Amino acid sequence: MNISNKVPFKFSLEVKEALESGKPVVALESNVITHGLDYPDNVTTAKNVEQAVRESGAIPATIGIDKGEFLIGMSDEQIEKFATASHVPKVTSRDIPVVLASGGMGATTVASSILAAEIAGIKFFCSAGIGGVHRGAETSMDISADLTQLTRSRVAVVCAGAKNILDIGLTLEFLETWNVPVISYQSDDFPAFYCRSSGFKSPQRLDELAVIAKAIEINWMLPGGKGVLITTPTKPEDALDNQKIDIIIQEAVLEAKKKNIVGNSLTKYLMRMVDRETDGISAKANMAVLVNTAEVAGKLAVAACLQSSTFFARIKSQ
């Protein structure tokens, strides 16, 4: 059954032709355009990320929702529309039915982008960092849908680890419990967004993209094999000091508790506080992380195609 025929999708011509011809495609989220960066940095970064994917040999597919249908691949005009709109709701997996049914507009998170990518037949997705288990989740139960979607969708996610504002130790425990393979590319450490190390060792290290592609393929052949998380640290010249960032976050978490900031608002508040306390340096680091992960994701998608011409067809048929 072709689910994409039943869910309202609008493919860009570039993405449609790439998927039909078996070319490597990398999905991208739109939440970073509407909520992650300010204008015009959001537009510049979105285009730079797409260009990084193209220069790696793959086709970028920025995902969003507009007029009640998924956009799989955005034009420059559509990116500009998302970047300048006064209010675009942040849409995670559970919000998709309501936003599509109401004919509205929505910026897709990691979780909803992964879901849309899977339905569209795209096997690779990249983001600066995934959501995870929040600090204090033992009482708040604040766990990102990014994690649960990884356990459900057969998509390989390339990122710079989990955001520093999270409890990364518990995030790794969650991924282990739900059998999500975590592979760090050319690094022993699990990165933390714009910090090269979170202080935690990565469960697995692989140094060749072709081997990572093979591991992904094998995972999808196994019963129950779903998402795979591939982490790549930001470049040394773009990295921030993990200890300094952690001190800022600890203080921001305390302030958030005093102000009763919870749920979807918490992540944005904490990231804004980090940006403020670093005099905007973290925002620039964020942009660099996005481009770096896009480059690696593109190369990985290409490696998957090169190692086996039937890679995507074989997985899709299962």
Swiss-Prot record:
One Gene Ontology term of the molecular function aspect: metal ion binding
Checking SUPFAM superfamilies in the record gives: Indigoidine synthase A-like
Q: Where is the active site?
A: E29 (proton donor), K163 (nucleophile)
Which amino acid positions bind Mn(2+), per UniProt?
A: D142
What high-level taxonomic lineage is stated for the organism?
Bacteria, Pseudomonadati, Pseudomonadota, Gammaproteobacteria, Enterobacterales
Q: What does this protein do?
A: Catalyzes the reversible cleavage of pseudouridine 5'-phosphate (PsiMP) to ribose 5-phosphate and uracil. Functions biologically in the cleavage direction, as part of a pseudouridine degradation pathway.
Q: EC number(s) in its UniProt entry?
A: 4.2.1.70
Annotated transmembrane regions: none
* Protein name listed in UniProt: Pseudouridine-5'-phosphate glycosidase 1
Record text on subunit structure and interactions: Homotrimer.
